[in-house]
């Protein structure tokens, strides 16, 4: 059995205009330590998929199993990083991260709590901003806090919902490189959804393109045959990059034209 198994998951929403099928039967499997990306157009259902795996909403059909346990509600074994920073504005960087530490380690001594909290703040290179509040931070720094908070729960699975899409291009590239470094050190199991093909190729081991919907499904898996550690400067010149990018782009364009 895979570490994460998503089988036949469907989800519809009902509005005054009637029912809309968002996901029409999602199948997905991850091994422990894998970094998988789901790529699709805006509005295709990527956030709905993350919310289902995170236990924030229930599926209409199908099952989600993580490490042998069914997913039916939110839990500390699944960390989440959203597009919006979702930080508590009245708390410092330290206190925002410490909340996550407390959630999974309520019995820690004060010294151990401080050590663990500072460890994850240092992991995202924010030690100098430890006592600053979110309003004193740039957008990129706020998102680093969100990543630190997600990792501080030591989750079995980290879910990332377009975490860098609200950032400017330079900050986005910096945080992508930071995430590469952190993943290389921690080897966490990660699912990231994004509409940026190059971001997915840079970060992921395997990529699933998603059809536009309604009734979105995942297309065939595309393996990213790039060695790690990866360097964006040379990546675009490699045959593996060009093959992966061509496969994703052609699938998504064909879906838009109604050919897939």
Annotate each PLM feature.
Residues 105, 109-129, 181:
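Conserved ABC ATPase "signature" region
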Residues 62-74:
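Conserved ABC transporter NBD signature motif
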Residues 147:
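Hydrophobic anchor residue at the start of the ABC signature
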Residues 132-135, 153:
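Conserved signature/switch motifs of ABC ATPase nucleotide-binding domains
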Residues 54:
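Helix-to-loop junction immediately C-terminal to a conserved catalytic motif
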Residues 39-41:
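The feature captures the beta-strand-to-loop junction immediately N-terminal to the Walker
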Residues 158-161:
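Catalytic Walker B motif of ABC-type/P-loop ATPase nucleotide-binding domains
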Residues 91-100:
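Short coil-to-helix segment of the ABC ATPase nucleotide-binding domain corresponding to the Q-loop/switch region
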């Amino acid at each position: 059995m895979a570490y994460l198994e998503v089988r036949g998951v469907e989800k519809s929403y009902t509005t005054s205009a009637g029912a809309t099928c968002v996901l029409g039967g999602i199948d997905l499997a991850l091994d422990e330590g894998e970094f998988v990306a789901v790529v699709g157009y805006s509005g295709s259902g990527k956030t709905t998929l993350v919310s289902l795996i995170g236990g924030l909403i229930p599926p209409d059909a199908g099952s989600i199993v993580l490490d042998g346990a069914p997913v039916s509600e939110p839990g500390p074994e699944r960390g989440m990083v959203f597009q919006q920073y979702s930080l508590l504005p009245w708390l410092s960087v330290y206190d925002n991260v410490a909340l996550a530490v407390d959630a999974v380690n309520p019995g820690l001594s004060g010294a151990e709590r401080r050590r663990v909290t500072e460890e994850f703040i240092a992991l995202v290179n924010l030690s100098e901003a430890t006592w600053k509040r979110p309003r004193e931070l740039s957008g990129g720094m706020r998102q680093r806090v969100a990543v630190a908070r997600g990792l501080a729960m030591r989750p079995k699975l980290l879910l990332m919902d377009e975490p860098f899409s609200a950032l400017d291009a330079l900050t986005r590239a910096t945080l992508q490189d930071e995430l590469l470094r952190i993943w290389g050190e921690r080897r966490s199991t990660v699912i990231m959804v994004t509409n940026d093909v190059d971001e997915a190729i840079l970060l992921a081991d395997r990529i699933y393109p998603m059809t536009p919907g309604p009734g979105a499904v995942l297309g065939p898996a595309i393996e990213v045959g790039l060695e790690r550690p990866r360097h964006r400067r040379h990546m675009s010149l490699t045959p593996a990059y060009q093959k992966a990018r061509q496969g994703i782009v052609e699938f998504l364009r064909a879906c838009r034209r109604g050919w897939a």
